[in-house]
From Swiss-Prot:
Transmembrane segments: none annotated. The gene is rplX. Part of the 50S ribosomal subunit. One of its GO terms (cellular component) is ribosome. One of two assembly initiator proteins, it binds directly to the 5'-end of the 23S rRNA, where it nucleates assembly of the 50S subunit. It comes from the Bacteria. This is Large ribosomal subunit protein uL24. Keywords: Ribonucleoprotein, Ribosomal protein, RNA-binding, rRNA-binding. GO terms for biological process: translation. GO terms for molecular function: rRNA binding; structural constituent of ribosome.
Amino acid sequence: MANVTTDIKRNDTVAVTSGKDKGKQGRVLRVIPDKGRILVEHVGMVKNHVKPNPQKNIKGGIAEQESAIAISNVALVCAKCGPTRVAHKGEGKQKSRVCAKCGSDLTGK
């Protein structure tokens, strides 16, 4: 997959719009633009079987962790109006992300 440009950044709050976790909201932990995927806190949970390793002081067992979901399956959440698309205001260095519905600033999230 080609490198995907996205308006979603790390630590943004997003809502899942499709898939098994539809309707859930969470904070973005990591963006993987070359694969078009993101990691969202407490979304897309999978179980990972971990072997014990006494040298590294790892107990072992079944651990739950987030798996990556497609960027197209999430929408940025505006504090005022909920899930929304992103619009841009300004030019050059002054360019900022704003809510497409109400126009509030999303840059400082």
